[in-house]
């Protein structure tokens, strides 16, 4: 595809896509080799997600994670959390489920069929054919596995197939793990937006990343190669 510069007229078929994409993304199930993304259901998923994100020991099959610092491993750079009780997490997830311009998906491990994390399409702007991947977190049982790599690949493949031109990834500028992950997966760094938010009583500067539709074929090949040479999930080591 052509690289578009400022002022470049867009083809009629590109402009027409804006009329076909809803503000709230349609529910969808995306299935990969190790993980599947399904619309999050509080009754089905919330209790298990809470049990795997509150700092208490986790056991999943033969894999075990000892007690860990949930704030450090999961919640430090997110808008809310950690959550002492299930009700708090459920309220947080419900806001994402009902967001008028987003879609909340549960990351499920296919081998066990159980939840290990949450990903979202957020800030959907069909008028400009752009969308963001955000509010992403994983239980320590799924960290240092293929979960984020495969989930991100599935999310990107889906929206570029729908005709989006731009997918964004934003994170706290201090979140070095997220910034490193974005670059590894082929997002391009665009800069830092200073004083973007006040979160949990502190200033947040935001690092911006993106992939454009004409870049996607190259990025998809990169992600496919990464998945092919990454070994299947091993027992994770907590990083408390």
What are these model-derived regions, one by one?
Residues 170, 188-202:
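Conserved catalytic-core motifs of GNAT/GCN5-like acyltransferases
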Residues 155:
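Flexible ATP-lid and adjacent glycine-rich G1/G2 motifs of the Bergerat
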Residues 2-145, 158, 162, 202-240:
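GNAT-family acyltransferases
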Residues 148:
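Short, conserved glycine- and acidic-residue-centered signature motifs
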């Amino acid at each position: 595809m052509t690289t578009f510069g400022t002022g470049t007229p867009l083809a009629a078929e590109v402009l027409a896509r804006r009329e076909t994409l809803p503000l709230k993304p349609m529910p969808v199930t995306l299935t990969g080799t190790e993980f599947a993304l399904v619309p999050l259901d509080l009754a089905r998923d919330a209790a298990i997600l809470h049990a795997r994100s509150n700092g208490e020991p986790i056991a999943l099959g033969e894999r075990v994670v000892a007690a860990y610092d949930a704030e450090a491993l999961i919640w430090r750079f997110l808008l809310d959390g950690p959550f002492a009780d299930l009700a708090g997490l459920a309220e947080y997830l419900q806001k994402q489920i009902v967001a008028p311009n987003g879609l909340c998906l549960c990351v499920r491990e296919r081998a066990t069929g159980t939840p290990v994390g949450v990903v979202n399409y957020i800030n959907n702007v069909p008028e400009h054919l752009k969308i963001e991947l955000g509010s992403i977190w994983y239980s320590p049982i799924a960290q240092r596995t293929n979960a984020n790599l495969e989930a991100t690949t599935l999310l990107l493949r889906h929206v570029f197939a729908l005709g989006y031109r731009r997918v964004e990834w934003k994170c706290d500028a201090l979140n070095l793990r997220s910034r490193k992950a974005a670059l590894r997966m082929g997002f391009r760094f665009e800069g830092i937006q200073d004083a973007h938010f006040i979160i949990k009583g502190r200033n947040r500067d935001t690092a911006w990343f993106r992939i454009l539709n004409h870049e996607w074929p190259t990025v998809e090949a990169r992600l496919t190669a990464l998945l092919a040479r990454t070994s299947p999930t091993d027992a994770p080591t907590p990083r408390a």
